[in-house]
Amino acid sequence: MVAAKKTKKSLESINSRLQLVMKSGKYVLGYKQSQKMIRQGKAKLVILANNCPALRKSEIEYYAMLSKTGVHHYSGNNIELGTACGKYYRVCTLAIIDPGDSDIIRSMPDQQQGEK
């Protein structure tokens, strides 16, 4: 019960930070565009939905590791990630280039340490 409440709270904070990135920052949606930004070294953080295909997930993680880009595994599926981004379509992969006014990049390592 307590763990479920904590994950809901962290999900809400991630969603609110994502909305701020959508308004004030620069980002790309989609696998191909995200991979392109990672290879160019422009991506600061990559967010993957939990139902992202395994091959795509491993490729993104590999390229992110090479370019020293952070990867966050979003706890919702691609429909929920799309909704969190304010889009009416599914989003499996999202790369944040410039967070704008959001502190999403600084807050992600804390979130990941809490999950382990």
Curated annotation (Swiss-Prot):
It is found in: Cytoplasm. InterPro entries: Ribosomal_eL30, Ribosomal_eL30-like, Ribosomal_eL30-like_sf, Ribosomal_eL30_CS, Ribosomal_eL8/eL30/eS12/Gad45. GO terms for cellular component: cytosolic large ribosomal subunit. It holds the Pfam family Ribosomal_L7Ae. Component of the large ribosomal subunit. Belongs to the eukaryotic ribosomal protein eL30 family. This is Large ribosomal subunit protein eL30. The gene is rpl30.
